[in-house]
Amino acid sequence: MPKQIEPVALDDAGSALVIVDQTLIPNETRYLRLTTPEETWEAIRSLRVRGAPAIGIAAAMGLYLGVKGSEAADFEDFYHEFRQVKAYLASARPTAVNLFWALDRMEACLLRHRDRPIPEIKEALRAEAEAIREEDARANRTIGEYALSLLKPGMGILTHCNAGALATAAYGTALAPIYLGQERGYNFRVFADETRPLLQGARLTAYELMQAGVDVTLICDNMASAVMKNGWVDAVFVGCDRVAANGDTANKIGTSGVAILARHYGIPFYVCAPTSTIDLRCPTGADIVIEERRPEEVTEQWYAKRMAPEGVKVYNPAFDVTDADLITAIITEYGIARPPYTESLKELFRRKEEAERRA
């Protein structure tokens, strides 16, 4: 795992959300201290913190900080303030379900403690936010173990966007088996799509993997077919921002194209995600809201000067949906789901509920 990367955490005093500003990597590693809902909202919206699990963690911690200073004297007034902050943070980005899952979990915690004094409710909210982070770290490693069971030493792996330590609490999702394999001498060869237009693969994945000593080769998105045709790719691993009940999966724009290429070349295509990213209330990928972002991200953001004609129309969706029938398996902390996903995903949640009852 990359050394000294802690993308999202509360400080020891519980007075600030500390994030690494991912818009500056790989040229600079700068930590930001966020203390207000407005700062947390901006960090999520601007991708200073990104990756579905990390967004959920940041939202939970930002919600706690948003009500920590409340002077409400009774529960109803405190709950009113809480709901306002929750709704505001929920508006930061529409696609990653972890954002809404984490905020809903914080509200459930508050309601469980509604008969407690306000200071005790605040402490319970802090503990819940910390628990979300700790659980994600454990899930990362377990996902990595399940995914590693599908691989052999020396394999070539292609990944898209960034689903590593920067996107989660620990090892990541799609990169977790790569890190575990590196620790055990598997010596994987990794191809990282640059992931236009925001270059998460070039800026973040290549950076992470190099920090960990992994053999990584950066490629342009339109080179994926070439490396697959050359026989250099044995498996594709990606993370995701939302899985629908039928297995359709929303992930960074370009993922669907990679899945189609993998199907053509007979390469298994795996999605790695914690169960918090699976939304059984969402029937299919058609029901997932796809975020659209600023045209400038395509035309000029990473260039010394503008690289497209002034006034040209730009379509800039942040995500696309990979159809379930293109996905070989969905790997979670409760096991590996295979088609038909309408059944296997429900089975994962049955296992999860059983594990929670035993805990």
Curated annotation (Swiss-Prot):
One of its GO terms (biological process) is L-methionine salvage from methylthioadenosine. Its EC number is 5.3.1.23. It is an enzyme of class 5 (isomerase). The record marks C161 as: Transition state stabilizer. Substrate binds at R50, G51, A52, R93, Q200, N251, K252. Pfam families: IF-2B. Keywords: Amino-acid biosynthesis, Isomerase, Methionine biosynthesis. Pathway: Amino-acid biosynthesis; L-methionine biosynthesis via salvage pathway; L-methionine from S-methyl-5-thio-alpha-D-ribose 1-phosphate: step 1/6. Gene3D superfamilies: translation initiation factor eif-2b, domain 1, Translation initiation factor eif-2b, domain 2. SUPFAM superfamilies: NagB/RpiA/CoA transferase-like. The keyword Amino-acid biosynthesis applies. It catalyses: 5-(methylsulfanyl)-alpha-D-ribose 1-phosphate = 5-(methylsulfanyl)-D-ribulose 1-phosphate. GO terms for molecular function: S-methyl-5-thioribose-1-phosphate isomerase activity. The active site is at D241. Catalyzes the interconversion of methylthioribose-1-phosphate (MTR-1-P) into methylthioribulose-1-phosphate (MTRu-1-P). Belongs to the eIF-2B alpha/beta/delta subunits family. MtnA subfamily. This is Methylthioribose-1-phosphate isomerase. It comes from Symbiobacterium thermophilum (strain DSM 24528 / JCM 14929 / IAM 14863 / T). The gene is mtnA.
